[in-house]
Curated annotation (Swiss-Prot):
Official protein name in the record: Xanthohumol 4-O-methyltransferase
Major place of residence: cytoplasm
Major enzyme class: transferase
Pfam annotation, one family: Methyltransf_2
Record field: pH dependence: Optimum pH is 8.5.
Activity relative to temperature: Optimum temperature is 39 degrees Celsius.
The gene coding this protein: OMT2
Subcellular location: Cytoplasm
Species of the source: Humulus lupulus
Assembly mode: Homodimer.
Amino acid sequence: MELARNDQTEAALRGEANVWKSINGIADFMVMKCALELRIPDIVHSHSAPITLAQIASSVPDSPSLNLSYLSRIMRLLVRRKIFSQHKSLDGEEVLYGPTHSSRLLLSKTTLPDQVTLAPFVAFMTHPYLSAPWSCLARCVKEGGNGFEMVHGGRQLWDLSPGNPEFNKVFNDGMASTARITTMAILSEYRDVFCGICSLVDVGGEFGGSISAIVKSHPHIKGINYDLPHVVATAPTYTGLVSHVGGNMFEWIPTAVAVFMKWILHDWADEDCVKILKNCRRAMPEKGGKIIIVDIVLEPEGNGLFDDAAVMLDIALMALTRGKERTEKEWKRVLEEGGFPRYQILKIPALTSVIEAYPQ
């Protein structure tokens, strides 16, 4: 009897602890934002060995009256979240902070060809334009729609970029950072996915970073970067590799043997995805064509490395877009309605998966 009572007490305490952790979950994200604004990852990684709090403080830019106690509290949570490692000095008197694999992904700039950073994506997701829509989740459930449009007068996320250079840069840099990490994972694990393709159009390809990397790795491919006119207008030139085409994927898609879409369809409702997929089908030949979709395949009951992040990102899409993350069953339905009844899912070492779909 006593044992059962103790078990119930333990369960109740765990439940309470879980609620407290969720209540304060915003601290994780905002402390990460704080660390990037203070350039803490850059500072720690610029040293060859773990460094003291005072060394970090002395290197924070534009901070003549930095509060060392506050900085210590910020570092305490970052260590607890394993963003940084913590050590003792040789005399045991001081705490030292060192880099981790996580902090490497938060550097402001990459210097090596195989190096990636998600710092721009953190800056994007914590931008004030994206913060307010989260308070509208209950209204989203009651009324449908998404929080971003509710807060911003019916304008979608991408509607704010053309007339706002500051947000446009934050948006583009954020998308480019996720594109790079995903494209590198694909090229390292599934190079064969691009074999036998003579032409490839990257729909929603932003500035062309992904398609240029693919063509460099597979020189036989004619690469087309396709995005809205105001996006490709400022895209860099990839001489001999990629041509830029401006347009609207809901209206038409440039002709190619294969279509590549990375983190695009999850931004849209099912009926919108079907329209896009049908346009993709029209853009490719009757035989030999395929679509390569790079997106999350949800496993709600899964315990994989990225499953928790995937479910959380699905809620972000509810707040910010008209889209959602999809299970395999949901992907199958959308693909079939869009004209792609055959598909296979390839796992890659990333948050996303590769879905190869065929019109026959």
